Regions:
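Class I S-adenosyl-L-methionine-dependent methyltransferase catalytic core
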Residues: 1-122
Length: 122
């Protein structure tokens, strides 16, 4: 795996093989980040089920200020922490090992134009 854009472009990301999981393919990352690239710069990112951190690292490479990485796999988070160290992004990374989340709450505003303001709020 590798970083596909931003200032870390071309840098390797350590992978981890575990049954039932697979890394996000480069073309999927390219499509995903192409659609949200205008919101990444100076943003704070939450990478749930982060694994080795491919998506959060990509966001940091593209200019995000901070990324919260959350996963329940203690072993895989060792690889994430190695990636964070190897890429020198520890100051922008917060890693949490959580066995479970009871709820994830998000209240979408009634006025959908407000979503744009929230996404671009600094």
């Amino acid at each position: 795996m590798r970083v596909i854009s931003g200032y870390l472009k071309g840098r390797n990301i350590l992978g981890y093989n575990t049954p039932g999981t697979r890394p996000t393919m480069d073309r999927v990352k390219e499509s995903m980040f192409a659609s949200i690239q205008d919101y990444i710069d100076n943003s704070t990112i939450l990478d749930l089920f982060c694994g080795t951190g491919s998506l959060g690292i990509e966001a940091l490479s593209m200019g995000s200020n901070k990324c919260y990485f959350v996963d329940n796999g203690k072993e895989i988070l060792k690889y994430l922490n190695k990636n964070i160290d190897n890429l020198n992004i520890k100051d922008k990374s917060i890693v949490t090992c959580s066995e479970s989340l009871e709820s994830i709450l998000s209240s979408v505003p009634f006025i959908l134009d407000t979503c744009q303001q929230i996404m671009s709020a600094q």
